[in-house]
Amino acid sequence: MVPSLLNLPFAELEVGQHLYWQIGNLNLHGQVFLSSWVVIGLLLLLVVSGTRKMERDPKGVQNLLEYLWDYLRELAREQIGEKAYRDWLPFVGTLFLFIFVCNWGGALIPWRLVELPNGELGAPTADINTTVAMALLVSLSYFYAGLSRKGLRYFEYYVEPTPIMLPFKIIEDFTKPLSLSFRLFGNILADELVVAVLAFLVPVLVPLPAMFLGLFTSAIQALIFATLAANYIGEAVHEEAH
């Protein structure tokens, strides 16, 4: 019974296998760097192709980029506020586009065609190191935003409306990056595993609904991450009316 189960296709699925690059005493996840470079290359190609010949009446890729710009500008303005959103629009937009292409790339790019000595390529956002790094970057960004706009007055936030709130707001600073990173990582990894298992069990047509659902949830996760990042920055720069 046990040997027969081990021979099933889904028994070949491996989780947590990595291609390591050793630099000094550091072990880096090589496949995450490789897939991230592919994503960055795709984004650069998209931007170059859409801005190479700008037209007054936008078409094709230029039209898509202008639509994305308008959408992200409104998102940043709504979450951060009129006074500060322009400074942070490039950051929020870059987060959204990178996560969006990472998530969709995990479902649409045939990563398995590239053979590695160990592990396999996939969405960079399905690796906890990637999502934690981005979440910590968001935390540093809203600290910087608050301090650069308010100076030391930023720390008044921790004792308002009463000093009793100090420990809770310190804990909040730790839970924000945790929730950002694990939400994105968990959703993208779960999508990839569900599609992989279905593709092994029933390779024809059956995985397609799960793939389409994964594309939808991947887009939503990119939007949630970017919106929360903008919201945290907006909270840091917000001036209370007196």
Curated annotation (Swiss-Prot):
Keyword Membrane in record: yes
Subcellular localization: Cellular thylakoid membrane
GO molecular function terms noted in the UniProt entry: proton-transporting ATP synthase activity, rotational mechanism
This protein's record includes keyword Phosphoprotein: no
Membrane topology qualifier: Multi-pass membrane protein
A GO CC term attached to the entry: plasma membrane-derived thylakoid membrane
Annotated Gene3D superfamilies: ATP synthase, F0 complex, subunit A
Source superkingdom: Bacteria
Primary location recorded for the protein, binned into one broad class: membrane
InterPro entries: ATP_syn_F0_a_bact/chloroplast, ATP_synth_F0_asu, ATP_synth_F0_asu_AS, F0_ATP_A_sf
Keywords from the named record: ATP synthesis, CF(0), Hydrogen ion transport, Ion transport, Membrane, Thylakoid, Transmembrane, Transmembrane helix, Transport
TM region(s), chain numbering: 28-48, 89-109, 128-148, 193-213, 214-234
Subunit annotation: F-type ATPases have 2 components, CF(1) - the catalytic core - and CF(0) - the membrane proton channel. CF(1) has five subunits: alpha(3), beta(3), gamma(1), delta(1), epsilon(1). CF(0) has four main subunits: a, b, b' and c.
Cited HAMAP family: ATP_synth_a_bact
Family: Belongs to the ATPase A chain family.
Protein's job: Key component of the proton channel; it plays a direct role in the translocation of protons across the membrane.
Protein name: ATP synthase subunit a
